[in-house]
């Protein structure tokens, strides 16, 4: 039994079910806790809501945060049943610790975009503008996927940027830009989509782009392995993929 530790993430609780789109019609029940990357904050509750329509006797609790923080919590004994990471490196930490129940499944991909204040008042046109002295830039910390991806993209573009701050996760970057506390931040396309009207997205060209790949796995010792694996199956089902696409995610 893994010891419970304090969770540093926000929790969302939803009823969960299966649907025929998963290929499994048998109802499921019980509870599971899903540790998920912060960029999934909008999409995963909707996935859970759709699953709820068929079986309200099961429940998902979502804990969202940076993938690196969640991976550390799991290796320290946090009671997670499913881990959904925004990168393969943090999932590999769980695999190496022999804490996965089965092979992780890729369920989505994402790409980067520059989030700027609505209307783009600083006329930021690309990554090179992030090095301008009149642009207040924020990035996610390099220890979290979005931060590492941002640095990789800047390196590809040959840009040396000096962020005013390094945030705990990608949603913190988005919030600073949307609140006017920063002029720009490198986030995911899905983040810009979620903040439509509050920020404007500036495209990053293909040659400088970095693709984020999202794997999910059941955590060994889950209190409800059947439901944990059923949720992952739903993510890769046509219905699950359709919901993720609505939020701007691409296929894995």
Task: Name each model feature, range by range.
Residues 1-15:
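Sec-dependent bacterial lipoprotein signal peptides
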Residues 9, 17-53, 68, 72-75, ...:
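Exported/periplasmic ABC-transporter solute-binding proteins
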Residues 32, 58-60, 112:
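Conserved beta-strand core positions
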Residues 57, 79-80, 182:
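Short, high-confidence coil segments that cap the C-terminus of an alpha-helix
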Residues 81-85:
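Periplasmic-binding protein-like
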Residues 100-102:
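Short, P/G- and charge-enriched loop/turn segments at secondary-structure junctions
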């Amino acid at each position: 039994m893994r010891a419970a530790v304090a969770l540093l993430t926000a929790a969302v609780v939803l009823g969960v079910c299966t649907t025929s789109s998963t290929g499994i019609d048998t109802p499921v029940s019980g509870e599971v806790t899903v540790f998920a990357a912060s960029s999934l904050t909008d999409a995963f509750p909707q996935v859970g809501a759709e699953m709820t329509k068929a079986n309200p006797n099961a429940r998902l609790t979502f804990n969202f945060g940076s993938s690196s923080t969640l991976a550390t919590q799991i290796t320290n004994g946090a009671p997670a049943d499913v881990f959904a990471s925004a990168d393969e490196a943090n999932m590999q930490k769980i695999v190496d610790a022999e804490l996965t129940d089965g092979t992780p499944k890729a369920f989505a991909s994402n790409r980067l975009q520059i989030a700027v204040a609505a209307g783009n008042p600083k006329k930021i046109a690309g990554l090179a503008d992030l090095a301008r002295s009149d642009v207040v830039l924020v990035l996610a910390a390099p220890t979290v996927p979005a931060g590492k991806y941002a640095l990789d993209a800047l390196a590809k573009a040959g840009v040396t940027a000096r962020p005013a701050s390094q945030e705990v996760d990608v949603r913190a970057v988005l919030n600073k830009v949307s609140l006017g506390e920063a002029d720009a931040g490198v986030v995911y396309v899905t983040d810009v989509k979620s903040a439509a009207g509050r920020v404007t997205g500036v495209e990053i060209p293909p040659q400088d782009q970095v693709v984020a790949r999202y794997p999910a796995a059941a955590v060994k010792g889950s209190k409800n392995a059947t439901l944990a694996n059923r949720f992952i199956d739903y993510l890769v089902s046509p219905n699950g993929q359709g919901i993720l696409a609505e939020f701007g995610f691409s296929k894995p």
